[in-house]
C-alpha cells in the first residue's frame, strides 16, 4: 500500500487528537443524538486558530453502499437521502446545498519519497446577501477510513453546508450537517494515491 501525504491548502494533516475548546459544547447537534456521532462532531480541531481551516477524523459509518445503490444524481436529492441515513431525527425543511465555485487542483507523485501529493486553491466567491461583498469560508479537511475500504483525505468547502469562518465555536451553528462531510468533498486522495478533484469555472465548454 502506497504511503500518502497531502498538501491540501498547504496545511499539515495529522492524527493528533487535540481537544477542541470547551466553547464547542455550546454549538447544538439538533438532529444528532447518538453519543459516538456527537463525540465525533465535537472532535474537530481548528488547524491554525483562525476559524478558516478545520480538520476532523470522520469515524462514523457514512453508509456509502446504501448511497451508491440509491442511484440519486441530483445534489439536493442526494443530501436529503444522506440526512435520512445519518441523522437520528429529521428536520422539517429539506436539505439545500449551495454550489458556486472557481478553482484548480493538482495531484503528483513525489519522486524522492514515493508518496503522493495533492493540493488545491480555494478561491470560492460566496456573495453576501446584499451582493456587495463576499463571505469568509471555512475549509474542512476530512479523514475517512471506512471498514473494508480505502483510507482517504478530502477537502470540503464549509459554506456549501452553510458554515462560514468560525462556525465551529460561534455557539449557535447546528453541527448536524457535518454528518454529510464525506459527500460534500470536492476533491480528495486515497491511500493508493488515487486522486479526484471537482472543479468549476464560469467558462464555455471546451469543444
Can you describe what each PLM-predicted range is?
Residues 9-12:
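C-terminal motif of bacterial Sec signal peptides marking the signal peptidase cleavage site
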Residues 14-207:
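N-terminal mature-domain region immediately after signal-peptide cleavage
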